[in-house]
């Protein structure tokens, strides 16, 4: 008999809008833990742990090599270097430490994971939800709810937006290759004119081939359900275009480094909530004043490209900088705006109006555009607010005039640019802005503004579940940061306590005990009573040596051994006295990583017949020589211009090769030569004897603009590093 399924469409942290799917008890229980919940992992990735240890040892080698200087910084927009001193070049104490650490890793006891934090039903529910291609799971656009939609409903809203010819046009095929050529031509010019170095050019070239951009939606369930695309069934979606790995991804980072500082120079700029609260403390009101909030509707998709580029040009002119390549930056920005093609449901589109959320520079670009809009619209207004503050597309102000005057003010603003539409809320007592409620209050006979915490109606306060597989200090840190936020926003103790009660009531069902919560609350309250308001600490890690591993019982045990070994090294190396090892943990996969994807999953994904031959490596070892090396970067069968390794699964021997072409193409050539013997080569003879099905290929290192000479040199280095020459490997003498 199947598991009982709930007919209730909603749960405290889950909104199920799917008509064809109902949540089982196990699925409801699983999702209610939140998308940040991490299930207890079932195994330790020893390869990754070995690579992490190597990275730590590399830091120690470099520290010794450069005279224990802690002030070294990497040039911006460059790939991290993998270079490290040879073993022969390091001191004997450090060599001994490395040996002790490696021995500690090799002798790690088999650490048992704590009790599984999911029931058998929840584990099966995770598998079922992951494999269900008929539904789409997304986090809500605002708040912390998880939204489940029918695939058909999600597609309906997506195509409603994509069929708007004003914003998007269909394409027969992607144009990324053509765009990549244009981007690289501009980058080559920047390098020729010495605005960027060769290392920066290599970084900004990006991945080859570039990853296709993906379009997806975040459901706006905070909107009035009666106004949804299909009322109460299909909410409107916020369009996002994932830019990761595209031909302009690194270029967007470079552009943002120039645009972001300029975007903060307008008079209405608000950095964050705390800046906003501090600004309001200085405001004095006249009797009869109103306060208002204004929201710019769908700002990103409504920005006129010509006006947006002109706004950027204007701010470049306003703040000239001879070291800034203005014309090239504008060309790169224009390409990012006009060549923003993407894929959705195996179809291709081009965005022709506005910009996509997902670009690194999108926020700064929108900020500059609105700053220019403000500069040109305010002279048209006969009456202006006495206070006008803006955080991106959210505006707060004080209006000392009549309601009629405010209505006239809004008409002027709404008619200034055709595409810019504003929604306003004018109130005599209080308005909501960001995560604050701003209210008019009298203090010492003076009218001013106070603030308290504002919780959106869709906010379920679904902070990290206490049983999630995280380090213990994480839970306390999350709660503490919220309580600090309450005290920095709220003016009155009663408001702090009200917000705290709301949060704690939501956290108790999520595994947090009353004693645990009260203890943190007491600690924060006492720190503020002493006049110490905890703030974000400045970077103080100049004498810290990071040891970064994925959180598991094995990594915790290894960290302890490594710190002990480092303590002994400090006794013999005086220069290390001011340094200490700090352990930082990388998270395991959470529910969002498993269940939420940018791409819409295909009903029947095509299986690449070459996929069984490919394996992702984090660490490579030649067992016939005991030589090893970490593998950095991510690779696939589409990766090109790279060094690769082929291992025989029978005898574990390695072959190192290089190719300019996609790895898939090189693999096909190797398989053809194995199946059709016509050369007397060690590699092909070996797999003719052991079977091509025992061949496994992996990417080891790649470079976007490597020449043949560079690839051949890298190939020799890898062969030497692992000693893969026959008979220790399958490479022939060069």
Residues covered by each model-derived region:
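Charged structural interfaces that engage phosphate-rich ligands
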Residues: 1-734
